[in-house]
């Protein structure tokens, strides 16, 4: 009897040890595709990685991250996603609307869950059935832009502004809704506007030259990744011409735009990682996991550009204060990591 009891205890211990080892060895492969190399999207991915590493330490699991960047190339994007499917990743992350849309169409038959990050209009892009109940294998985080809030800041800084440039890439779904909202708002106010577009950096630079030649009073750009990628190439000439550039993300201001308003992309990245954890570790039903939205109402002003425009930062911060939760300064740099150097 004692031998039998000893054998049972030994087996129990062995099974427990095996179970513990299995739990320790639990690993998940996450495929991340970035749309373009810019400060906003890079910050999102950096914070996804950091947050997943924290969770890995807290919960004794491993995340293997496969990351690639299509750099605005649709065929490269499809190849990256095909590779993720072939590698049988446990979950995909699509950073920005075009990547999310392609991931959705390519994974519908696979059952691979997709978490999108920084999609401005998930409903308009046809990614989800509703913001509260996406209804398929995809959900994520949205960087929806309050266009009216940005225009409140434009007219707070310059009540006499009467000629507004709308600078964007018409091919970007992220720009469709905010540009339509901007037109409606300006038409209601009886303020003239003109559209300028570009699909790559060279075209955006030419568009900026046209804005200067047309002597516009201000420029509005939503969360447009094409313009974001070109900001370092246009901010100086706009500032020298005395034309402030108002944009939909703090990363534009980091790269020299006068103002960035909207979502904190570091926070969005961490929230995206938490959604990954909910699906992979906690067993959440992705079809019922609501899209996350953010509204921190922060206006980020580039103090270098502010000075180049001949504006006083303190006066601008005071003018902006009634229209946002906070006003914060930033100086020009290529990436957020450079600010700490």
Language model segments and positions:
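Sec-dependent signal peptide cleavage junction
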Residues: 18-26
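Hydrophobic alpha-helical segments within soluble ligand-binding/sensing domains
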Residues: 121-163, 263-284
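Pocket-lining segment of extracytoplasmic ligand-binding domains
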Residues: 173-245, 249
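An alpha-beta-alpha
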Residues: 30, 48, 139-189, 285, ...
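Extracytoplasmic "Venus flytrap"
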Residues: 29-50, 55, 66-76, 171-175, ...
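Beta-alpha junction/loop-to-helix N-cap segments that form part of ligand/metal-binding clefts
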Residues: 66-129, 224-239, 243-248
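Hinge/cleft segment of the Venus flytrap/periplasmic-binding protein
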Residues: 278-341
């Amino acid at each position: 009897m004692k031998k039998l009891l000893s054998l049972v205890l030994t087996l129990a211990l062995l099974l427990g040890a095996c179970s513990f080892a299995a739990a320790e060895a639990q690993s998940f492969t996450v495929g991340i595709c970035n749309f373009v190399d810019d400060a906003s999207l890079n910050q999102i991915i950096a914070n996804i990685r950091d947050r997943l590493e924290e969770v890995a330490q807290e919960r004794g699991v491993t995340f293997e991250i496969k990351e690639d960047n299509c750099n605005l190339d649709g065929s490269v994007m499809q190849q990256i996603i095909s590779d993720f499917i072939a590698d049988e990743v446990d979950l995909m992350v699509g950073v920005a609307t075009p990547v999310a849309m392609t991931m959705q169409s390519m994974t519908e038959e696979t059952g691979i869950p997709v978490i999108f990050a920084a999609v401005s209009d998930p409903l308009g892009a046809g990614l989800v059935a509703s913001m509260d109940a996406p209804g398929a294998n995809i959900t994520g985080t949205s960087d929806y832009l309050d266009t009216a809030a940005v225009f409140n800041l434009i007219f707070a800084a310059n009540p006499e502004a009467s000629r507004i440039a709308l600078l964007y890439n018409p091919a970007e779904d992220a720009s469709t809704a905010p540009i339509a909202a901007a037109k409606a708002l300006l038409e209601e106010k009886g303020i003239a506007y003109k559209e300028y577009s570009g699909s790559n950096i060279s075209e955006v630079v030419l568009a900026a030259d046209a804005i200067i030649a047309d002597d516009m009073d201000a420029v509005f750009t939503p969360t447009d990744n094409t313009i974001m990628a070109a900001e370092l190439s246009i901010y100086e000439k706009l500032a020298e011409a005395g034309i402030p550039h108002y944009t939909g993300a703090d990363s534009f201001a980091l790269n020299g735009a006068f103002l960035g308003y909207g979502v904190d992309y570091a926070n969005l990245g961490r929230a995206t990682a938490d959604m990954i954890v909910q699906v992979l570790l906690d067993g959440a039903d992705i079809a019922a996991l609501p899209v996350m939205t953010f509204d921190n109402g922060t206006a980020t002003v580039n103090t270098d550009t502010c000075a180049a425009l001949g504006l006083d930062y303190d006066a601008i911060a005071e003018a902006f204060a009634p229209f946002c939760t906070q006003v914060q300064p930033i100086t020009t740099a290529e990436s957020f990591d450079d600010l700490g150097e």
